């Protein structure tokens, strides 16, 4: 009898975990995001950075916010000269978020770093974010990217 109870409990926990994960991974409603836009959009080019790839000269293992660079989250580095428009990204500060739009797709990213080191770019995506816009990572640069600061706290990810 104890085995049945433990199995039932494990099953219930598994179902709950899957439900929560599915709910969090769903796209955010576009109208809610547009209501939170807290500034004019900046339009320009974007590229990708990953300080752990051999030969990359950009950044280091830690971001400007103090977080370790993680290629698997929805994050980006905003151009240093735009730092104040995006909440003054700095070590230990509360993260800020932005709505990024390009090639017919939208995503909320956490702005946790500054850069890009490449002239002419307004934002550098980490690997996960870049894969949304360029799944093969072959483009290298995406032009016509719109980046809008968001007020408040957000769960980063695609916007539907």
Regions found by a protein language model. Give the residues of each.
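Secreted/periplasmic proteins
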Residues: 23-160
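Bacterial N-terminal signal peptides
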Residues: 10-19
